[in-house]
């Protein structure tokens, strides 16, 4: 079985489920999953996991995402986008200065109430199904993070503004648009929504598909991305034959500090070592470069000899992904084990 990622661009007008069906028809009997459903009226990046890559989907779901969206001011729809019915209007339209200035109010940790027309479940039933039946939907507020928000364009004639945002998982852009409009003493809904990035997957190198006849299986595989690609900014350990066998069979596996831990900071990280031999402790400062700005930022990692704990890292064997998991006092606890070769041992 092939194991890789596909960076697919979902066009507007089809559902994420329909796109999954299209990809399945192209690839045949292969295990497939995707990270982060997009609304029918939305377009943009929808990463696909093939084979063993499906075991890593949860990491992409947690990844930061970027969107470009356009808000129409002066009206509100029941769905928060142009697919819904107009339920309220207001004559107050913000100025260009106000549309730009409001962004700073939303950057940081934000509490957001998801829209009634969402896939969240209420007592086991999808919220959007209840909303379509005209039933009242009450969803609990959620804590999300807006890392960046800026206005790209303001069209006074059409009463619209286009925004760019980088946000955490669980962020509803339709709700963000409504909240922006309310903060400007107006109403608003999304008329265009495009997801431009999910983790490492960007729109400039995405594969665009509208039907199974547009591309062959070989062409898809030629544009595939290696399964380890999304792990490049996560700490990694190399396993010996005996360690790999222990992990493979779910046994307790210990890593030696002196031999294994000095090389944790690899790939996107640069390692700076600072030691205090009297206290027998070490502090690692991992410095990562932000590709979009060229700036670097530090990720502190406190390490005590023989008692190192890491929430998430991956283990490879002979250059191949073996498992992801956590490290507790030098003991590796696997979360997922991968079968990427037929004859591992």
Swiss-Prot record:
Reactions listed under catalytic activity: uridine(55) in tRNA = pseudouridine(55) in tRNA
Record carries keyword Isomerase: yes
Enzyme class: isomerase
UniProt cross-references to CDD domains, sorted A to Z: PseudoU_synth_EcTruB
EC number: 5.4.99.25
NCBIfam families, A to Z: RPE1 (TIGR01045), TruB (TIGR00431)
Stored HAMAP family: TruB_bact
Protein name: tRNA pseudouridine synthase B
Gene expressing this chain: truB
């Amino acid at each position: 079985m092939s194991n890789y990622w596909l960076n697919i661009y979902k066009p507007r007008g089809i559902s994420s489920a329909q796109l999954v069906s299209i990809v399945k028809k192209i690839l045949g009997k292969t295990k497939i999953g995707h990270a982060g459903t997009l609304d029918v009226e939305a377009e943009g990046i929808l990463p696909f996991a093939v084979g063993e890559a499906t075991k890593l989907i949860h990491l992409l779901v947690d990844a930061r995402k970027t969107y470009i969206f356009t808000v129409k001011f002066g009206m509100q729809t029941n769905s928060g986008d142009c697919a819904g019915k107009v339920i309220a209007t207001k004559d107050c339209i913000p100025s260009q200065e106000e549309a730009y200035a409001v962004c700073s109010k939303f950057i940081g940790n934000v509490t957001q109430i998801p829209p009634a027309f969402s896939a969240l479940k209420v007592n086991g039933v999808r919220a959007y199904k209840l909303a379509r039946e005209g039933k009242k939907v009450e969803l609990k507020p959620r804590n999300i993070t807006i890392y960046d928000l800026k206005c790209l364009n303001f069209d006074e004639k059409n009463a619209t503004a286009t925004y760019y945002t980088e946000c955490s998982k669980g962020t509803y852009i339709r709700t963000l648009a409504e909240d922006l409009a309310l903060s400007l003493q107006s109403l608003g809904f999304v008329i265009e929504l495009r997801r431009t990035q999910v983790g490492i997957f960007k729109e400039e190198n995405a594969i665009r598909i509208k039907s199974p006849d547009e591309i062959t299986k070989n062409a898809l595989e030629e544009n595939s991305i290696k399964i380890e690609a999304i792990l490049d900014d996560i700490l990694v350990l190399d396993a010996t034959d005996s360690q790999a066998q222990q992990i493979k069979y779910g046994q307790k596996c210990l890593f030696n500090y002196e031999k294994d831990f000095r090389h944790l900071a690899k790939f996107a990280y640069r390692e700076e070592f600072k030691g205090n031999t009297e206290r027998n402790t070490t502090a690692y400062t991992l410095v990562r470069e932000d590709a979009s700005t060229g700036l670097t930022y530090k990720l502190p990692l406190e390490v005590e000899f023989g008692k190192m704990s890491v929430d998430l890292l991956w283990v490879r064997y002979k250059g191949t992904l073996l498992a992801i998991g956590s490290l507790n006092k030098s003991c590796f606890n696997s979360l997922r084990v991968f079968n990427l070769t037929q004859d591992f041992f």
